[in-house]
């Protein structure tokens, strides 16, 4: 039975397949949303509407005020951005335990938070979205530091600062153009990359657990569930193969082990090189059992009593069994064997 073998070629093929699968499940990066009153998309007719698909990513950005950038407002605006269901978003209300995305409270830093639209999140606190459902990103504060904790109204009502996310749906009319991930300047400064494009989304940032203060780079997007599952499956198969190979090697080594050492039988103490069993019973010579040791005990002379015409197995409760046997013709000195 051969053990499974995983050569370097198999590992390389598995890695290539995993990379290809991860490439298939990666989505697109939507145009970022710059969250402050300088973003004119909030005042657009019909509101700020996006049509993300499962697998897409969306960046929410809080432009800094010091030094001012291309998307900065005249004065810094303080916001907390919440993800809410459709009915709550239409009323501009956040629940008592809101789903906080980003807090814009760092005037000297550009803050960013990346949303990954996925049905199942590998992160315990990750966000999950259902296709063909509507969600809202809203800000319910009034733009001041003192109003950060407000959970209803605010700029969502007064300035229309909310974004409607129509997940898995097609746009009616004009859709916000989407670019592939490779074309998005993810590693460059967002302000410089999009300064010449007036139709970009504007969203304030918040240094939450998933938000980072960014100079040139932001947080890495969370891994997609299919890619994580594929990697875990490949690792499980590899571990299973290694365990099988180890088990097969142990099994073969055990089979190749020599059988338990046995004590050689007693030497040839009589005719035919075997222990002779006393006459009378018509029994022929008997081969020594494993572990027996026969030692001849000779009598003192002809005055010794005749030996027994049979053999008897003495109790072996306290050691190896002992046999008393007869060997040789009656006229010769008696040979008695016992086992030590």
Swiss-Prot record:
Pfam families: Ephrin. The lineage of its organism: Eukaryota, Metazoa, Chordata, Craniata, Vertebrata. This is Ephrin-B3. The chain crosses the membrane at residues 228-248. Its main location: membrane. A motif (PDZ-binding) lies at residues 338-340. Residues 267-284 have a biased composition (Gly residues). PROSITE patterns: EPHRIN_RBD_1, EPHRIN_RBD_2. The keyword Cell inner membrane does not apply. Residues 1-27 form the signal peptide.
């Amino acid at each position: 039975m051969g053990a499974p073998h995983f050569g370097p070629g198999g590992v390389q093929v598995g890695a290539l397949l995993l990379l290809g699968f991860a490439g298939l499940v990666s989505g697109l990066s939507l145009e970022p949303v710059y969250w402050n009153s300088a973003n004119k998309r909030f005042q657009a007719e019909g509101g700020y509407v996006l049509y993300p698909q499962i697998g897409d990513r969306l960046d929410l950005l809080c432009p800094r005020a010091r030094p001012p950038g291309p998307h900065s407002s005249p004065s810094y605006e303080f916001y907390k951005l919440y993800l809410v269901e459709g009915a709550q978003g239409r009323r501009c209300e956040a629940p008592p335990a809101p789903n906080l995305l980003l807090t814009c409270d760092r005037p000297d830093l550009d803050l960013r938070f990346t949303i990954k639209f996925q049905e199942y999140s590998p992160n315990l606190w990750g966000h999950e979205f259902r296709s063909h459902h509507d969600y809202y990103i809203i800000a319910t504060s009034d733009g001041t530091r003192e109003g950060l904790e407000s959970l209803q109204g605010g700029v969502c009502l007064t300035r229309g600062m909310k974004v409607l996310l129509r997940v898995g749906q097609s746009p009616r009319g004009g859709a916000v153009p989407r670019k592939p991930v490779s074309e998005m300047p993810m590693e460059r400064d967002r302000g410089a990359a999009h300064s010449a494009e007036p139709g970009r989304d504007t969203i304030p940032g918040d240094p939450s657990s998933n938000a980072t203060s960014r100079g040139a780079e932001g947080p890495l997007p969370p891994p997609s569930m299919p890619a994580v599952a594929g990697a875990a499956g490949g690792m499980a198969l590899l571990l299973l193969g290694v365990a099988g190979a180890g088990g097969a090697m142990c099994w073969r080594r055990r089979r190749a082990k020599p059988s338990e050492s046995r004590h050689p039988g007693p030497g040839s103490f009589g005719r035919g090189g075997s222990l002779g069993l006393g006459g009378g019973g018509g029994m022929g010579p008997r081969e020594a059992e494993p572990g027996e040791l026969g030692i001849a005990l000779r009598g003192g002379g002809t005055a010794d009593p005749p030996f027994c015409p049979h053999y008897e197995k003495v109790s072996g409760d306290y050691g190896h069994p002992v046999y008393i046997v007869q060997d040789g013709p009656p006229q010769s000195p008696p040979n008695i064997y016992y086992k030590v």
